[in-house]
Amino acid sequence: MKSNRPKHIPITKIKNQLLSSLDNRALVLIGLMGVGKSVIGKRIATMLCLPFYDSDQEIEKAAQMTITELFKTYGESEFRALEQRVILNLMKNRPLVLATGGGAYINEDIRKAVHKNGISIWLKVDLDTLMQRVSKRPTRPLLQTENPKETMQKLMKQRYPIYAKANLTINSHKENRQTVAQNVIRSVQHYLDTEKNDRNNQHANQNCHC
């Protein structure tokens, strides 16, 4: 029985095939704050020679203020509305690698656009690793609570069932960022190969007159 694990082929050898099979789609990284979407996304984009965008950075450019200031001044609902406009606009620049904010994929309209025009990749990290990482940036709006760890656990409970709708899930807490980026690329190539095989099998079945 053949393994479903992506083969460890050098990235340089699968790059051109991946870009051809990607067919003008976006690679969209989703997951909670602190999983490393931006850092890993930049590395993926560099290895594949694709443009990289961070939706939070693009939101700050559009609003001319920080995410923290946006939350404080206009509230979360206004931030989410701007987030949707920015991400849907960024998706027009395909192919690209896009790192999204933790709540973006929860938005149904964003989720539909990602599934229509991209491949969604959930970067998953355990709670302790997350808390260790987010503690380095104490200004995160959603963690301005008396018990940030409890808040993070609630976010996991709320968001994980929706994150699970992603095309791919990559557990990234045990690997360094470069290795995770390489794992993402290999998993995307494996996904595209499977997608192509499924199309070929479907086409063969449709043309079968036996």
Swiss-Prot record:
One cellular component term from this protein's GO annotations in UniProt: cytosol
Subcellular location: Cytoplasm
EC number(s) per entry: 2.7.1.71
Pathway this chain belongs to: Metabolic intermediate biosynthesis; chorismate biosynthesis; chorismate from D-erythrose 4-phosphate and phosphoenolpyruvate: step 5/7
Alphabetic keyword roster: Amino-acid biosynthesis, Aromatic amino acid biosynthesis, ATP-binding, Cytoplasm, Kinase, Magnesium, Metal-binding, Nucleotide-binding, Transferase
Residues at which ATP binds: 34-39, 140
Pfam families xref list: SKI (PF01202)
Molecular function terms from GO: ATP binding; magnesium ion binding; shikimate kinase activity
Binding site for Mg(2+): 38
Keyword Magnesium among record annotations: yes
Superkingdom field: Bacteria
GO biological process, one term: aromatic amino acid family biosynthetic process
Entry keyword ATP-binding: yes
Cofactor: Mg(2+)
The protein's enzyme class: transferase
Residues the record lists as binding substrate: 56, 80, 102, 159
Cofactor binding annotation: Binds 1 Mg(2+) ion per subunit.
Summary of the function given for this chain in its UniProt record: Catalyzes the specific phosphorylation of the 3-hydroxyl group of shikimic acid using ATP as a cosubstrate.
Subunit structure: Monomer.
Family from the record: Belongs to the shikimate kinase family.
Matching NCBIfam families: PRK13946.1
The name this protein goes by in its record: Shikimate kinase
Lineage: Bacteria, Pseudomonadati, Pseudomonadota, Alphaproteobacteria, Hyphomicrobiales
Record gene name: aroK
